Each structure stands twice: as structure tokens, then as C-alpha cells.
């Protein structure tokens, strides 16, 4: 399963890769952004992904672009540390594509999908993080669970869902995505006016909690800002309002010259696009996953 990169043309237009440049693809996935960057200029790409399953895509890209793509299995919050270890101090651009990939959703064994039965896992990396979705649904208190589902999923029935999960686990441990989805659907019915599955928001919330995604995003952008050359760019494509809000706030802090995550960056930044860039109708038609994508970008002065 290949993950179709979203807003690819728009990302490339803004990044504008140059010969001799050094770029970071902070969310490598199946390598769509990395391939496009490498095709655009005679440059180097340092690619990061915490999902060890993405290594096979790196191998293919490495054969196509020998000595120009460098791959690291790690969290993108470690960008600075990763690059320091290979004596790279500054880069010309960092690209983030936030959230779960099509490959992860399609693989039932990863436990991300409510439409495919599999073990309750949801970890982006099975080697880097220990807490999984099964632990969340079977051990977290009802109050904390309801708060997570509400805050990270925007689910108005969060209390009802949390109560149903706790009632179910008191009888039998919840082990699969199918069991969890059935519990949620038993207390929340599908809206007549909306095609969204009742389990969608809860699964999103649990995934964000398991992977500490919002905390990772804050750290990742702050580290990226710290390693940019003058004229360097950070581009973030996000898929839901929580992520986009974090990007918007951090970019504003950077433009206002405020410190981010205890990093006092000194140099100024400016927004590249004042308004969010969204996919065209044509892209949404050919790749429905793109419909909620938002792109924000910032330039180091």
C-alpha cells in the first residue's frame, strides 16, 4: 500500500529545493515527499520516521538516489539530536506531514482502523513506545478516558463512550479494534446527515494519546526552527483542528520573536502564507484523504 502524499505540488512550490541544499522529511512514510524533493534539485534529504515498517520504502529510494537520501528510525522531536550525530548543524527546509498514514490504516495488524479488526495497538512505532491502545482502554480511569476522548477527539458523547468501555472491560478485557468499535457503536448511533463512523473520533483520540502526538508536534517544530539556515522554511501539513491550532500558535510565537519550548531562537521568522493552503477539488476527488488537509509554512529571516 502506497501512501499518496497530500498537497505535494504546493509543498514543493513553497520549499523550492535548490542544488546543494539540505532538507529534512520529518515524516518519511512511503517517501512521497522525499522523492519529489530529490527529483527537484541535486540536494540531500535526511528522512525520519518512527515507524520501522517504512524502511523498505527508504531502500527503494536509496537505490534510485544513491548517497542523497539518509534515513533514521526515530521520533521527529529528535531532529536536532539526529542531525548533530551526523555532523549536520543547519538545514534549508523541514517538512512535516502529521498524523496516521494510509499504510498504517490499511494494515489491520497495526490496530489503527475501526473498519478492519486487529489487535488494539495504535503505536506509530512498536520499538520506540511501550504504551498501546489496549492498555489505554483496559486501565485508564473512566474520568481520564472521557477527558482524552473529548479533548483529542472532539467527541461530544465522550462520557457515554467512556462509561460503556469501562462497563465492557469489567466483564472481559478489550483486545481488538473490532470489540472497541462495537462498544462505541452500541452507545452512539451514526448521524443521518453525516457519513462519519461513530468510532472515528474516539479512535483518533486514543491514537493521539498513545503516541503523544501533540507534544511531539510542539517539540518537532521548535527543534526544526532551531536548525534552519537563514532563508530556510518549515512546512507543516496537518489533518485536524488540534494539530493545526498548535502549528498556528507556534508559528505566531516564532514570528513575534517569542521563545518556543525553552528555545530562545533570536532570529526572526515570517509566515509564508497568511491564509491556510488547502487541497484543490481535483486533489480531493482523486484522494479523498486530502479533504481535511491544511498547509502552513514559515520562513527564517
Swiss-Prot record:
Residues that, per the record, bind S-adenosyl-L-methionine: 31-33, 49, 76, 97, 104
GO BP annotations, alphabetical order: rRNA base methylation
Keyword Cell inner membrane part of the UniProt annotation: no
Top-level taxonomic group: Bacteria
Gene: rsmH
Chain segments annotated as transmembrane: none
GO MF terms, alphabetically ordered: rRNA (cytosine-N4-)-methyltransferase activity
Organism of origin: Ehrlichia ruminantium (strain Welgevonden)
Subcellular compartments: Cytoplasm
Known catalytic reactions: cytidine(1402) in 16S rRNA + S-adenosyl-L-methionine = N(4)-methylcytidine(1402) in 16S rRNA + S-adenosyl-L-homocysteine + H(+)
Protein name in UniProt: Ribosomal RNA small subunit methyltransferase H
Functional note: Specifically methylates the N4 position of cytidine in position 1402 (C1402) of 16S rRNA.
Record keywords, A-Z: Cytoplasm, Methyltransferase, rRNA processing, S-adenosyl-L-methionine, Transferase
Enzyme class: transferase
